[in-house]
């Protein structure tokens, strides 16, 4: 698995570290991943269309997406330092093959309740998808 850039980085932070404009960075990294036999890419779900546009048009690479969040009991998203986050449903709608859920559970006020809520959301999304 290859990593594009961290979900905790903003676009400006990514540029400050990599010092390349996005299209060039995407194309170069995706070409390297394919050349070295990587089976997938770890990225924000928001990057999936860009990854496909700039080098994975044939969808050879699996998309594994961290930065999955859930609403807090107060209706606000739980980010825990992540800048580019999505809900499980949004990640699926954007084309994620797999999602990674960590801090949204482990750093919540009630990890069990949060895990149950996420499971329900994921199952509901899967059921809606299977009906189509």
Language-model segment annotations:
Residues 31, 35, 53-56, 97, ...:
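Generic secondary-structure signature for well-ordered alpha-helical cores
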Residues 66, 101-104:
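Glycine-rich beta-strand-to-loop/alpha-helix junction loops that act as flexible
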């Amino acid at each position: 698995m290859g990593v594009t850039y961290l979900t905790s980085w903003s676009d400006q932070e990514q540029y400050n570290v990599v010092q390349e404009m996005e299209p060039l960075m995407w194309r170069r990294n995706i070409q390297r991943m394919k050349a070295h036999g990587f089976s997938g890419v770890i990225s924000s779900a928001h990057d999936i269309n860009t990854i496909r546009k700039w080098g994975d048009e044939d969808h050879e690479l699996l998309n594994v997406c961290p930065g999955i969040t859930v609403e807090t009991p107060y209706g606000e998203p739980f980010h825990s330092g992540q800048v580019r986050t999505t809900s499980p449903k949004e990640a699926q709608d954007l084309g994620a093959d797999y999602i990674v859920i960590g801090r949204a559970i482990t750093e919540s006020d009630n990890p069990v309740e949060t895990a149950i809520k996420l499971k329900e959301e994921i199952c509901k999304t899967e059921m809606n998808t299977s009906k189509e």
